[in-house]
């Protein structure tokens, strides 16, 4: 569980931020920075908090950033510049496509780790849920304290609450091979943070739509006042 918390943000957080109507650029930027810092910060934090040393390859992280984040972002920018009108036509359905993709990912993870998840009991699931909730609330409250705007608050809360659980599973398997359950928290987190993140995204997206409606009403009122 500590190892999961010490890992950088995962790319799933970018998708959840998009579904939530948050600041995707900020989310991607935070993921890139935390991933590049992971070779230094993850071993240091795990050593301080758990008294164990894990090795994280810097170049593996760089390659991961390029393949999973930079290339998709650049392709998206290129596609929008090439066929912007067509992209705008399908942009409204993309959140639904993202949700379907996340459901398929969750299904795959559960299928692969079904035996471990069933055998873990309520304890590990509860700890993972609390871990995820506290991370999101920490990011949310920190953003609120500094009066960060709505979309960026959403991005920060999601980014802080969702870690790269796939990396956590890989590191646990490589560094704690003697303990077969070491990969369990990461596997459960892979499922849970997508579920909790999707719920949070739905709440924040509804809030964003309400704010947009209020802004529209205020603009109409202002126009009416000016006419009078």
Segments (PLM) and residue ranges:
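Alpha-helical transmembrane segments of multi-pass small-molecule/ion transporters
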Residues: 1-228
């Amino acid at each position: 569980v500590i190892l999961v918390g010490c890992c950088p943000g995962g790319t799933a957080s970018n998708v959840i931020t998009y579904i939530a109507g948050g600041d995707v650029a900020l989310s991607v930027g935070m993921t890139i920075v935390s991933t590049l810092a992971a070779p230094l910060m993850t071993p240091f934090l795990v050593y301080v908090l758990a008294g164990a040393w894990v090795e994280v390859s810097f170049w593996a992280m760089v390659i991961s950033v390029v393949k999973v984040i930079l290339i998709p972002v650049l392709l998206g920018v290129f596609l929008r510049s090439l066929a912007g009108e067509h992209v705008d036509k399908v942009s409204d359905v993309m959140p639904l496509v993202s949700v379907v993709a996340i459901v398929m990912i969750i299904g795959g993870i559960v299928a692969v780790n079904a035996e471990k998840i069933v055998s873990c009991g309520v304890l590990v699931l509860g700890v993972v849920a609390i871990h995820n909730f506290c991370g999101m609330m920490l990011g949310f409250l920190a953003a609120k304290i500094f009066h960060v705007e709505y979309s960026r608050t959403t991005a920060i809360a999601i980014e802080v609450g969702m870690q790269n659980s796939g990396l956590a599973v890989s590191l646990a398997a490589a560094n704690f091979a003697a303990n077969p359950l070491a990969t369990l928290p990461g596997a459960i987190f892979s499922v849970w943070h997508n579920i909790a993140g999707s719920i949070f995204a739905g709440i924040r997206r509804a809030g964003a739509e309400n704010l947009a409606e209020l802004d529209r009403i205020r603009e109409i009122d202002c126009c009416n006042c000016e006419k009078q």
